């Protein structure tokens, strides 16, 4: 039997980032919030499903707010103060995520809508039935 050697645990050095970009992907079923640095390297991310909401409760503005708070708290550990917000998708969490990030104390520099719009590409699916 081989003897066990103690594995060295290296503490990861957290980089200090002053400004970041909050990418909000708000679909009809879920909301994904990713906070990156200026180069696009992810610092933190959170989803409505990961915040404990399942099923139809994931697609609520409150679930998106909780996801934004979780991602924002992790990003504050990196020293992020200013955020540029990029929103993608038509979901119900579009506005509440921006409000939650603002309430956490981030200075929101710009808000832009980057929802991809086809130039008459693929045929869309049938109308959503309730």
Curated annotation (Swiss-Prot):
Pfam families documented for this protein: Ribosomal_S11
Molecular functions per Gene Ontology: rRNA binding; structural constituent of ribosome
Annotated keywords: Ribonucleoprotein, Ribosomal protein, RNA-binding, rRNA-binding
InterPro entries (UniProt xref): Ribosomal_uS11, Ribosomal_uS11_bac-type, Ribosomal_uS11_CS, Ribosomal_uS11_sf
SUPFAM superfamilies membership: Translational machinery components
Gene Ontology biological process terms from the UniProt entry: translation
Cellular compartments per GO CC: ribonucleoprotein complex; ribosome
Function: Located on the platform of the 30S subunit, it bridges several disparate RNA helices of the 16S rRNA. Forms part of the Shine-Dalgarno cleft in the 70S ribosome.
PANTHER family: 40S RIBOSOMAL PROTEIN S14/30S RIBOSOMAL PROTEIN S11
Family: Belongs to the universal ribosomal protein uS11 family.
Subunit structure as annotated in this protein's UniProt entry: Part of the 30S ribosomal subunit. Interacts with proteins S7 and S18. Binds to IF-3.
HAMAP family attached to this UniProt entry: Ribosomal_uS11
Name this polypeptide is given: Small ribosomal subunit protein uS11
Species of the source: Thiobacillus denitrificans (strain ATCC 25259 / T1)
Native organism taxonomy: Bacteria, Pseudomonadati, Pseudomonadota, Betaproteobacteria, Nitrosomonadales
